[in-house]
Amino acid sequence: MILYHGTTYKRAKQIFEDKVIKKDCERFFTEEENGDGYSTDGYVYLTNEVTFALHFAYCHHLVDKSEALVVFRIDIPDEQILPDYDEMRYQDPTGIDRERYDSDLNCSLFEFKTCRINTDISFDEYTVDYFCLDVDKVDNIGDLFDNAGCNYEYVTSHYTRKQKSFIKLIPWKRV
């Protein structure tokens, strides 16, 4: 499955140097800082929707003030993909959304557009592409992640013209 990982250029420099997206790293979203919205160590967090990866990269940019955003596109074998129980806990504390899906993974991917894997993503072992976006060169960057809080089906069927154009013109590069 093609999945995406969004981060800031400051963090991506280390990823490029190491040639790996690490499952154990310093987290932006910690229990101490974010309460229920924290990320568990030992996982690489991913999304099945490219503008959502950009949204997460932008949220991280607001913290570390990086000059650019980086989104990685990775081909992950289906058997490695796990539900993002952190996002499910945060977004669906009562479990109502989970009840509508036949599996936690489907709920995670199609309701919350997130998942995770419990291994590092080595550039030598996975097919990885990326693009870099200079934050200051995009007018109204928030327009690129319109409907970020909506489920996968809604987001992908309601892309704006700006989003469609952006997605079509992404200059993917192989790492």
Language-model regions, residue ranges each:
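Low-complexity, flexible helical/coil segments
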Residues: 22, 35-45, 82, 108-116
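Short, flexible loop/turn elements at secondary-structure junctions
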Residues: 5-11, 48-50, 75-78
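Short, surface-exposed beta-edge/turn micro-motifs
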Residues: 1-2, 40-43, 50, 67-69
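Active-site and NAD+-binding cores of ADP-ribose-processing enzymes
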Residues: 68-175
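Short active-site loop/helix that positions an aromatic residue
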Residues: 50-64
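Eukaryotic short linear interaction motifs
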Residues: 12-13, 54, 81
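Hydrophobic beta-strand residues in large extracellular and virion-surface proteins
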Residues: 3, 15, 45-46, 70-74, ...
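ADP-ribose/NAD+-binding catalytic cleft of ART/PARP-like enzymes
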Residues: 1-41, 58-59
